[in-house]
Design a protein with these regions (language model features):
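Domain-core detector
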Residues: 1-168, 172
Length: 172
């Protein structure tokens, strides 16, 4: 099996749609309800992060398995990483609400995206695989710098607090 450019682009597009949709739904919630009720904001954000984060993790599992098959790696099936827990979502909502409430949708998108990145890295660490940041689309200078590091052995050093490091909502 070979991973074609078309397959890879479809994968990236599907992940991006999940991230964007979660952010859009958060925006659609905030527009009529506002940000005054923190408990409701956290509960809604947590629901979005859980639902769309699970989708992101599942897509990452599917691509990881396809890549492993293409490489004849002989590794176990990929296991999804857990989406952000309630406490993580609450911290994001509280910090973002107090600094710049307009960024709440981006915070939700970032946590959704992180579930997919965490899934890939969790399985790469388990399997002793190598990984690389591969920018696609709009990418910040720091992500470009990370990509310039090339292939790296997956290990606990690549994880920050158990998560993929430097995940932006808008960097592909």
């Amino acid at each position: 099996m070979q991973i074609t450019a078309k397959m890879w682009n479809e994968y990236i597009s599907r992940l991006s749609r999940l991230n964007r949709k979660a952010g859009q739904l958060m925006r659609q919630y905030i527009d009529p309800h506002g940000t005054a009720n923190t408990d409701d904001l956290i509960a809604y954000a947590y629901g979005l992060v859980t639902k769309y984060g699970e989708g992101s993790a599942e897509l990452a599992c599917q691509m990881y398995d396809a890549l492993a098959e293409a490489a004849n790696a002989g590794v176990p099936a990929a296991e999804p990483a857990a989406p952000a827990d309630y406490g993580e979502v609450a911290r994001m909502v509280n910090a973002t609400k107090n600094q710049n409430p307009a960024n709440l949708p981006n915070g939700v998108s970032r946590l959704v995206k992180r579930a997919g990145a965490d899934t890939t890295l969790k399985n790469a660490v388990r399997d002793g695989a190598e990984w690389a940041w591969v920018p696609h689309g709009d990418t910040c200078p720091f992500c470009i710098t990370l990509a310039s590091n090339g292939w790296q052995k997956a290990g606990s050093k690549v994880l920050k607090g158990g998560h993929a490091e430097h995940i932006h909502a808008n960097c592909d």
